[in-house]
Regions:
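Sec-dependent signal peptide recognition
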Residues: 1-2
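Structured loop/turn residues at beta-strand edges in well-structured enzyme cores
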Residues: 6, 43, 107
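C-terminal motif of bacterial Sec signal peptides marking the signal peptidase cleavage site
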Residues: 8-10
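N-terminal secretory signal peptides
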Residues: 12-69, 128-139
Length: 142
């Protein structure tokens, strides 16, 4: 079997986040399902975001995301500023077999959880609408 590595040009740019890192991680974790063994991946991606020192979210499309946890022995993913890569076998990324690769390290994937990103976005839109509605404590628009 051939292991393929595809680089993910990072959206981890060092730009300050609107939310604290723990809040970002908790937001994704709240919408992540139970751990899965693997996911299909054709080597293409949309983006990625570090959410903890040993976790990142990889977007395979604009609406499909996976929360990946790597071995705790890996250095902080939060500080990775360049592209990352994922190893895969036959277009499948597997926990316990594949790794997240950066310029300086290879971090084995310990756990994969699919994020219900569409539901998360819908809930965030609903929250934003509620903040702007009368009686929600926000100032009404004039």
């Amino acid at each position: 079997m051939c292991a393929a590595i595809a680089l993910l040009a990072g959206c981890a740019s060092g730009i300050p986040l609107k939310e604290s890192q723990p809040a970002v991680r908790e937001r994704y974790a709240a919408y992540a399902g139970e751990p899965i063994r693997q996911f299909n991946w054709l080597g293409d991606y949309y983006s990625w975001e570090p959410v903890a020192k040993d976790e990142l979210v990889v977007f395979t499309t604009p609406s499909e995301a996976y929360l990946l946890k790597v071995w705790p022995s890996c250095p902080d993913l939060i500080f990775v500023t360049g592209p990352i890569g994922l190893t895969s076998t036959s277009h499948t990324v597997s926990a316990g077999l594949d790794s997240v690769r950066t310029e300086r390290m290879s971090c084995p994937i310990e756990e994969i959880r699919k994020v219900d990103y569409q539901r998360m976005q819908a809930d965030l839109r609903r929250e934003a609408q509620n903040k702007g509605s009368p009686g929600s404590g926000a100032s009404p628009q004039r």
